[in-house]
C-alpha cells in the first residue's frame, strides 16, 4: 500500500492529491493521510496553520488511510514507534522528497 501524506495549503494539497490519483490510475493501492490537519499538535510549529481545503470539493473521491495502516509502514507516535525507527530502521517504509521529481516513486509498492 502507498500512503500519500497531505499537508500544507491548497496548492500543496492539490499536488499531493494529483499524485494519489496518478498512483490509483496505475492500479496501485493508494490512500491519503490527512492526520496533519486532524491530530492535535501537528501544526504547532507552523506560522500559518492550515485547513484541509480538499474537503470543500464535495465529489472529490479520496480514500483515507487508517492509523493502523500508517503505523504498519512508519511505526506509531509513542515509545514503541520511536524504538522501531531507531533499532530497526529497515522496517520503516518512509520516503522523503529531496528534489522536485522522483521517478522512482512509481515503482514503490509499500511506502509512506
Region spans (language model):
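N-terminal targeting/anchoring "stem" of glycan-biosynthesis enzymes
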Residues: 1-112
Amino acid at each position: 500500500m502507498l500512503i500519500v501524506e497531505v499537508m500544507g495549503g491548497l496548492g500543496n494539497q492539490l499536488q499531493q492529491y494529483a499524485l494519489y490519483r496518478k498512483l490509483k490510475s496505475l492500479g496501485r493501492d493508494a490512500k491519503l493521510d490527512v492526520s496533519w490537519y486532524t491530530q492535535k499538535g501537528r501544526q504547532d510549529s507552523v506560522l500559518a496553520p492550515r485547513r484541509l481545503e480538499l474537503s470543500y470539493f464535495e465529489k472529490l473521491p479520496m480514500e483515507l488511510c487508517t492509523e493502523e495502516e500508517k503505523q504498519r509502514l512508519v511505526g506509531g507516535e509513542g515509545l514503541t514507534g520511536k524504538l522501531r525507527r531507531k533499532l530497526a530502521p529497515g522496517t520503516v517504509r518512509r520516503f522523503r522528497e529531496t528534489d522536485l521529481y522522483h521517478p522512482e516513486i512509481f515503482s514503490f509498492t509499500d511506502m509512506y
